[in-house]
Amino acid sequence: MDFMRTVLEDFQEETGNIYNLEATPAESAAYRFAKIDTEQYPDIITANPEAFREGAAPYYTNSTHLPVNYSDDIFEVLTLQDELQTKYTGGTVLHLFTGEKNMSGLAAKNLIRKITNNFRLPYITISPTFSICPSHGYVVGEYFACPKCDADCEVYSRIVGYMRPVNQWNNGKQQEFKDRKLFNINKQSKKVVVEEKESTFS
């Protein structure tokens, strides 16, 4: 990353143009390239080698993110990503896929405050999972069958910048969704000290 920043700055001086070092979303490419690579090189390492050997769709870990099943400890992941994410000059975001069934506005506010007071990442999203039942509408959490009437539900989660039905994602992204560890916002990492600092806003 430091090398790419240096090269980018050299190009800026040489051309007079302004360039960004961006974390590309690669939402489709992570699956497409893994699929092509595994067809040509069956032993190549993907993000999900065990599941792939058992017939699951292959995919690569996106950009410089940690593997989706690395940890459910939000503060451990924030600490590991903080230095990397701040090296980009644009187009970067860390999605926090929360395992809480129903995060209150106050809990979200407190989490954002804790993150912005202790980390330097430029962009984060709090990304819950929810479901839509044809009869009962919005259902908090991941339910492929409605907990009230057992009807088929559409499960929504974030892909790129949008909340979309998981069943419309490509096979690799659907496998990533299955593999993903959701963050437990109540889990305080033993490896990370997060201070409660005074905030300038309330």
Residue ranges and their predicted role:
Residues 1-202:
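Long, C-terminal-biased catalytic regions of enzyme "large/alpha" subunits
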